[in-house]
Amino acid sequence: MTVSAQNLVWIDMEMTGLDPEENVVLEIATIVTDKDLNVLAEGPVIAIHQSDEELAKMDDWNVNTHTRSGLVARVKESQYDETRAVAETLDFIRQWVPERTSPLCGNSIGQDRRFMVKHMSELEAFFHYRNVDVSTIKELVRRWQPELLDQFTKSGSHMALDDIRESIAELRFYRSHVFKI
């Protein structure tokens, strides 16, 4: 294990909805890659306990998706609160990157950052202010090379660790097909 400012930290969170003012985090997962997108380590995958009141705020899509994946049951059984989830995630990340060096990496990662600012500010503060957002590249490909879109498909499991693995694979695909690296 080598701490390096070149390593990239990938995070995905599942939430009860899209509004950090009204919704809460259900799950957080982390993966660290090197600069070439080789996975160095998978961090903790943490379901965060939320009250029945918070879970009741979910719309039908979230209820169906997170119940089908088993996440709702894991959240109800979890002993983790947001503070403990942040502490364990930071303990893992600090083994791989110095503070404020890694951009926050993922798909639509700006949404995760919004939830971090509201609910996990200590974790958000650990990251560089920049993002590596795979969805930005996808939106550009949709406009400039739409023929590539069908060549990469995701499962859409909406399980945090699976979503990160798919985001890394998607960026590898774009690196080889769009950037030709």
Swiss-Prot record:
<dbReference type="GO" id="GO:0000175">
    <property type="term" value="F:3'-5'-RNA exonuclease activity"/>
</dbReference>
<feature type="domain" description="Exonuclease">
    <location>
        <begin position="8"/>
        <end position="171"/>
    </location>
</feature>
<comment type="similarity">
    <text>Belongs to the oligoribonuclease family.</text>
</comment>
<protein>
    <recommendedName>
        <fullName>Oligoribonuclease</fullName>
        <ecNumber>3.1.15.-</ecNumber>
    </recommendedName>
</protein>
<dbReference type="Pfam" id="PF00929">
    <property type="entry name" value="RNase_T"/>
</dbReference>
<dbReference type="GO" id="GO:0006259">
    <property type="term" value="P:DNA metabolic process"/>
</dbReference>
<dbReference type="InterPro" id="IPR036397">
    <property type="entry name" value="RNaseH_sf"/>
</dbReference>
<keyword id="KW-0540">Nuclease</keyword>
<dbReference type="InterPro" id="IPR022894">
    <property type="entry name" value="Oligoribonuclease"/>
</dbReference>
<feature type="active site">
    <location>
        <position position="129"/>
    </location>
</feature>
<comment type="function">
    <text>3'-to-5' exoribonuclease specific for small oligoribonucleotides.</text>
</comment>
<dbReference type="GO" id="GO:0003676">
    <property type="term" value="F:nucleic acid binding"/>
</dbReference>
<dbReference type="InterPro" id="IPR013520">
    <property type="entry name" value="Exonuclease_RNaseT/DNA_pol3"/>
</dbReference>
<keyword id="KW-0963">Cytoplasm</keyword>
<dbReference type="GO" id="GO:0005737">
    <property type="term" value="C:cytoplasm"/>
</dbReference>
<keyword id="KW-0269">Exonuclease</keyword>
<dbReference type="InterPro" id="IPR012337">
    <property type="entry name" value="RNaseH-like_sf"/>
</dbReference>
<keyword id="KW-0378">Hydrolase</keyword>
